[in-house]
């Protein structure tokens, strides 16, 4: 891994000084365990199958080339099938082989012949790449769940291609202000209600209606700001006016789409209509900086800029490098999520928090989407996500597939 600056790669990243294999060997030599590199008490002195690399038949006996967990590739060994007690890995090996052959056939290329004695090198190479990909995605999934501060779990899935975790994305739970921008997360007033649902509360002080009904569903029209109770309020965590601040409550899956839209997000549980799903967070930058970055992003065909234009257009949220699950939510011209502006501890109207609520019931397994041209008013904006004048030079084709598709993201 090439050495890079800490600021460029994130404060928690440092250059790799030795290879993973060397590090594993050093751990074993010193009798040290390190879960993050696969060295555990279970396999420190014993062998555990990590994945299967290859297959052959010798004298009517089936053998698999085994990669041992926590051991370098140089220690891989051929083992007879009868010695392997890993049915799930054997099934995965078979599935990967089948998927590779199906992809080759779909591409109208010549299917490598399998004589049932040995695997063609291309098949074995693909199987190893898939195994390494699963390990990388599992580690990424574990990291995401360590960093999140909300109830809902995050899962990662890729059954489409060999794409691994993004190399330049860092999970955050709240806005990250760029140098020179200050976020004051301390409210200037708070309520003293005993029952915020029935009494005059924070929304009334701000001149708007309470956003939620008794079922914690949003009841105000798009374009109306949400004012939740804050840290100065005397109400407790069960207050009916504390919804967005509790974070995502649903288990979500970042998955690889099969139609060329990259990563997407789907819900693993049913979501009721008008329910809070997630926040859109990222790096808060000036609109001038957004203009500069927008030109670069357009040339790469990516779309992560969200203008904070509730009352002014001074700031933009850039989720390209820093963000949460919303970073992976795809666009749709007929979305199932709606944008709302939210104010909690920071009451600066130039810097609303961006919350995504369901517009209808969303079933388990369904992809989550929002309209990249939609702003908090509920209308199509000419200066909302990735659509400022400097970003109009390159138009990105829309692949949402909706009947009402406009053809372009910007």
Swiss-Prot record:
It comes from the Eukaryota. Keywords: Biological rhythms, Cell cycle, Centromere, Chromatin regulator, Chromosome, Differentiation, Metal-binding, Methyltransferase, Nucleus, Phosphoprotein, Repressor, S-adenosyl-L-methionine, Transcription, Transcription regulation, Transferase, Ubl conjugation, Zinc. Its EC number is 2.1.1.355. Pfam families: Chromo (PF00385), Pre-SET (PF05033), SET (PF00856). The modification Phosphoserine is found at residues 381, 384, 388. Zn(2+) 3 binds at residues 196, 229, 235, 239. S-adenosyl-L-methionine binds at residues 261-263, 330-331, 372, 399. Zn(2+) 4 binds at residues 333, 398, 400, 405. Residues 250-373 form the SET domain. It catalyses: L-lysyl(9)-[histone H3] + 3 S-adenosyl-L-methionine = N(6),N(6),N(6)-trimethyl-L-lysyl(9)-[histone H3] + 3 S-adenosyl-L-homocysteine + 3 H(+). Residues 189-247 form the Pre-SET domain. It is an enzyme of class 2 (transferase). Residues 394-410 form the Post-SET domain. GO terms for cellular component: chromatin; chromosome, centromeric region; nucleoplasm; nucleus. Gene3D superfamilies: 2.40.50.40, SET domain. Ubiquitinated by the DCX(DCAF13) E3 ubiquitin ligase complex, leading to its degradation. Residues 47-105 form the Chromo domain. Zn(2+) 2 binds at residues 191, 202, 229, 233. Belongs to the class V-like SAM-binding methyltransferase superfamily. Histone-lysine methyltransferase family. Suvar3-9 subfamily. Interacts with SMAD5. The large PER complex involved in the histone methylation is composed of at least PER2, CBX3, TRIM28, SUV39H1 and/or SUV39H2; CBX3 mediates the formation of the complex. Although the SET domain contains the active site of enzymatic activity, both pre-SET and post-SET domains are required for methyltransferase activity. The SET domain also participates in stable binding to heterochromatin. In the pre-SET domain, Cys residues bind 3 zinc ions that are arranged in a triangular cluster; some of these Cys residues contribute to the binding of two zinc ions within the cluster. Histone methyltransferase that specifically trimethylates 'Lys-9' of histone H3 using monomethylated H3 'Lys-9' as substrate. H3 'Lys-9' trimethylation represents a specific tag for epigenetic transcriptional repression by recruiting HP1 (CBX1, CBX3 and/or CBX5) proteins to methylated histones. Mainly functions in heterochromatin regions, thereby playing a central role in the establishment of constitutive heterochromatin at pericentric and telomere regions. H3 'Lys-9' trimethylation is also required to direct DNA methylation at pericentric repeats. This is Histone-lysine N-methyltransferase SUV39H2. The gene is SUV39H2.
